A protein has these predicted regions:
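Hydrophobic, regular-secondary-structure patches
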Residues: 1-32, 39-42, 75, 124-125, ...
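Residue-level detector of beta-strand face positions
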Residues: 21, 85-89, 167
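A short acidic, helix-capping loop that chelates divalent metal ions and anchors anionic groups
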Residues: 21-25, 105-109, 175-179
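Mid-to-C-terminal secondary-structure elements
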Residues: 39-54, 64-161
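Internal alpha-helical transmembrane segments of multipass membrane proteins
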Residues: 83, 185-210
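Peri-transmembrane interface segments
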Residues: 145, 150-153, 159-193
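Interfacial "coupling" helices/loops that link adjacent transmembrane helices in transporter permeases
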Residues: 203-232
């Protein structure tokens, strides 16, 4: 709540995770369970292809409502059945599907992993048996520099905890690192291509030089008897 009240914060969601076996009828698959709040989908900019997100009441009641991603839909509902309203088993917890989010492309490209989203209160109590939130996702307002907001968040948490027992990750910084790495790899590949062209050119030149050297005597005889350059 303290984070949500900050002027630079546009949205906040707790986040807890667990890996379980998901089951629907006779289909089983490894599934990542994400425990989040009702604001998570706005914070991450996720859109729904069908159904809807859970609400504050679901959080308070530890409801077994689940939102699934497109990969989960394709894995468990291969016959085209509408997932909304169906019940899947996540570990030992039966959960009713209330929404399906649109396919998302991450900074690292497309992923085949299955992700489902339940109220964080449900995941903590029914799956993990814990009371501590492992991480918090914060969306910063567009008009605020992300680096400055990151420092302000860290200072706020250190002040409230009395010690620096947390760390932050900035999505903008990660994106910039990936872009820089991609640019470096592009330059490296271009340099390798140039070197290959130079080596190839030297090889062709050497072959031509050897050919001319081997025919020096023949060329001299032809020129002596009046051969033109075009004849040679």
């Amino acid at each position: 709540d303290a984070l949500a009240e900050q002027p630079y914060v546009d949205g906040v969601s707790p986040s807890v995770n667990s890996s379980v076996t998901g089951r629907f009828k006779d289909i089983e698959a490894s599934t990542t369970v994400n425990g989040v709040s009702e604001d998570f989908f706005y914070v991450r900019g996720l859109n729904f292809q069908s159904g809807q997100p859970f609400d504050k009441q679901s959080i308070n009641e530890q409801a077994q409502d689940v939102v699934i991603d497109d990969n989960t839909k394709k894995t468990f509902f291969t016959d085209g059945t509408d997932p909304v309203g169906q019940v899947i088993l996540l570990g030992s917890v039966p959960s009713r599907i209330i929404g399906v989010i649109e396919p998302q492309k991450s900074m690292m490209g497309n992923s085949d992993s299955l992700n489902v989203y339940l109220p964080y209160s449900t995941v903590m109590s029914r799956m993990l048996g814990q009371s501590n939130v492992r991480s918090i996702i914060v969306r910063i307002k567009d008009e605020y520099p992300s680096a400055a907001a990151e420092n302000a968040i860290l200072n706020l948490l250190v002040q409230r905890h009395g010690a620096q027992d947390v760390f932050t990750q900035n999505a903008d910084s990660i994106r910039e690192t990936i872009q820089q790495t991609t640019a470096t790899m592009t330059l490296l590949i271009s340099a390798i291509a140039v070197i290959s062209l130079i080596v190839g050119g030297i090889g062709v030149m050497n072959i031509m030089l050897v050919s001319v050297t081997e025919r020096t005597q023949e060329i001299g005889v032809r020129m002596a008897v009046g051969a033109r350059q075009s004849d040679i």
